[in-house]
Amino acid sequence: MASQGTKRSYEQMETDGERQNATEIRASVGRMIDGIGRFYIQMCTELKLSDYEGRLIQNSLTIERMVLSAFDERRNRYLEEHPSAGKDPKKTGGPIYKRVDGKWMRELVLYDKEEIRRIWRQANNGDDATRGLTHMMIWHSNLNDTTYQRTRALVRTGMDPRMCSLMQGSTLPRRSGAAGAAVKGVGTMVMELIRMIKRGINDRNFWRGENGRKTRSAYERMCNILKGKFQTAAQRAMMDQVRESRNPGNAEIEDLIFSARSALILRGSVAHKSCLPACVYGPAVASGYNFEKEGYSLVGIDPFKLLQNSQVYSLIRPNENPAHKSQLVWMACHSAAFEDLRLLSFIRGTKVSPRGKLSTRGVQIASNENMDTMESSTLELRSRYWAIRTRSGGNTNQQRASAGQISVQPAFSVQRNLPFDKSTIMAAFTGNTEGRTSDMRAEIIRMMEGAKPEEMSFRGRGVFELSDEKATNPVVPSFDMSNEGSYFFGDNAEEYDN
C-alpha cells in the first residue's frame, strides 16, 4: 500500500487537494452535501413535487441527470455544432413522476440548461461546485455497477466476463476527475486503455500532430492512474512498460489483459465511497440539518446514520419484489457491487442475494413502460452494523467460486478471507511468458501461485454497532463459508446500454 504521503485521501480529492486536517475535510465534504441538498429542495419546488414525490428515487435520478447534463461542457459544445432533429442543445429534462388520482403519471419536463446551472450555483454559494457533480456521477456509477453486468463490454475488449469484479466505475464519464479516477477498478482502467490503443491501431493519425500530443499525455496519465492502483512492484513495472511504449499496439493490449487477470488475485487499491441519491440529502437539509457544521465523511458512519433516518420510495413494476429492489439500491449506496455477499449480509442484517436471484430490473423506468400498473413502495436502506470503507485490495485468498464472478473487490475494511477461484484464474496463465515483460510476468505468476486461501485480510478490523460512532468496539464477523460469495453468480443480469 502506498504511504499516505504520496496518495491523497479521497476527501482531499473531493476537496481541492489542499492538505487539510480531519475537521476541515469533514466540513468541506459536508459543504458539498449541503449544496446538493439545497439544489434538490429548490428543484422540488420548481417542479411542484409533494414530499412523497420528492422522495421518489426515480425523480431524484432525473433531477441529478438534468444538472449533470447542464454542466457537460463537451457534450453541450458537440450538440451546438451537430444539431440533431428534435433535440434542443440548450435544454435538458426527463421524466418526472407524480401521483394523480391514486395513479402514478409520467410527465416529461424540459428546462433551460442555463436555468438549471443558475439554480445549482445558487445552492452552492455561487460556485460551479464540480465536486458535488462528481459525487452524483459516482452515485450513478455505483447504481450501474449493482444493476448491470458488463459482459459485452468485457468481451469486446478481449477480456473475460468473469473478471467483472474489476469493473467498478466502468460507466463513469471521462470528466469525473481525481475522485472519479480513485473509484475506478483495475478492469475499468484497462478497458479505457485498450480502447485507446485500438483506436491508435485503426487510425494512423491518432497519436500524431497537435491532437496526438494531447492523446499521448492522456494515455500516459491513465497508465499512471492504473499503476497507482497496483500494490506489487512487478505489476507496476509492467505498467511502466506499457506507458513508455513508443507505439502502443497488440503487445501492450496483451500486457494490459495480463495485468487485469493478475488483479483477480493480486488485487489493486480501489476507493469506495457511499454516495447517496440527492433525495436523501434534500430532506435532511430541509429538516434543518447542517452538514457543513456537523461534518460528514463518505467513508465512515455518516452515510449509514443518514440512511437509518431517511425515507426513500421507488416505483415498482408489477412482478418486481420491493425487498430485492431495496437490496439493489442499498448495495449501490455503499459502493458494494463487488463485495463479498457474506459480509454484506452480516452488515445489513438481512440476507444479500446474488444479482441473478433478484426479481427486480433497474431503478430507471423506460419511456415506453406502462404507468397504469406501477405501484410504489418504501426502500429499506437501513443496516444492522456499519463498517469503514476501504481503498485497499486486501490480501488475497481463494474459495470455491461461481461460474460468473471469480473474485471480489472489497468495499469494507473488515477481517475476512477474500474469495477467489485460484484454479480458474491460474488456468488463464499457461505458458505465455515470452516477450519484453517476461521477467515481470514470471514474477507476477509466482506471487499468484503463492497466494494462500486461509490468509486473513484486514486482520483485526471489524464492523461496528450503529451506536458506536467512534468505532471503539469492533465486532469481527463470522461467516458461513458454504454460502456463495459472488454477487454476479453465473449471472443473467441485464447488460448495460448507453
From Swiss-Prot:
Motif (Bipartite nuclear localization signal) on chain: 198-216
Subcellular location: Virion; Host nucleus
GO biological process: symbiont entry into host cell; viral penetration into host nucleus
Cellular component GO terms, alphabetical: helical viral capsid; host cell; host cell nucleus; ribonucleoprotein complex; viral nucleocapsid
Chain span(s) of sequence motif Unconventional nuclear localization signal: 1-18
Post-translational modification: Late in virus-infected cells, may be cleaved from a 56-kDa protein to a 53-kDa protein by a cellular caspase. This cleavage might be a marker for the onset of apoptosis in infected cells or have a specific function in virus host interaction.
SUPFAM superfamilies documented for this protein: flu NP-like (SSF161003)
Predominant subcellular localization, coarse grouping: virion
Pfam family, any one: Flu_NP
Key words of the record: Capsid protein, Helical capsid protein, Host nucleus, Host-virus interaction, Ribonucleoprotein, RNA-binding, Viral nucleoprotein, Viral penetration into host nucleus, Virion, Virus entry into host cell
Ranges for region Disordered: 1-21
One Gene Ontology molecular-function label: RNA binding
Compositionally biased spans, kind Basic and acidic residues: 8-21
Function in brief: Encapsidates the negative strand viral RNA, protecting it from nucleases. The encapsidated genomic RNA is termed the ribonucleoprotein (RNP) and serves as template for transcription and replication. The RNP needs to be localized in the host nucleus to start an infectious cycle, but is too large to diffuse through the nuclear pore complex. NP comprises at least 2 nuclear localization signals that are responsible for the active RNP import into the nucleus through cellular importin alpha/beta pathway.
Subunit structure: Homomultimerizes to form the nucleocapsid. May bind host exportin-1/XPO1. Binds to viral genomic RNA. Protein-RNA contacts are mediated by a combination of electrostatic interactions between positively charged residues and the phosphate backbone and planar interactions between aromatic side chains and bases.
Protein name as it appears in the record: Nucleoprotein
Source organism of the structure: Influenza A virus (strain A/Swine/Colorado/1/1977 H3N2)
